[in-house]
Amino acid sequence: LEGVGITRPNLTGLPTTMIRSYWELGDILHFDPDTAKRNMELGYYDTLRAFGRIRGCAYAVDSGADSSADAEAFRAAFDAVQKEVREKYPVTLTADAALLLARMKDAQLAPLEAAAEDAGVDPTHFYTTRTLAQAFLAACDKDRMESFAPLFTGSSTAGQAALAALLPNTFLQALVW
């Protein structure tokens, strides 16, 4: 059992699964019903994830065949776009760094989850790969994403490539968008 200032070792020898939340759970000294409700929802999804019932790292994503196929197709499309942009503008490698810094464990969903987190998508819902993508599209700043469009068409300037390098998380969102 772990708590603030308390760590007790498992002396029973029984198999134990440690469940940790990806998200900041708020102030423990100040009780807020909304925060408690949010934490219970996140804890439920963290438990399902720990026992392999759902996938994702930050978001609760369905692990069924359709959602998994969508995740695989998404990652393949993302990798193709990223490779094409990286070959034209090597400075955009910072999107790779943003993805690594996000420390997402589900490789197929990592770009989508990192972009959704940066866009402020609510983690207390159960998603399929498709509905998480739709939630991201609804939450992201479309004008800002469109400002990176010349990088994808090959008509970009050095200034736009530099902006992508300076804003790796935003550029990662644009790659997902």
Where in the sequence are the language-model features?
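Patatin-like phospholipase
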Residues: 1-177
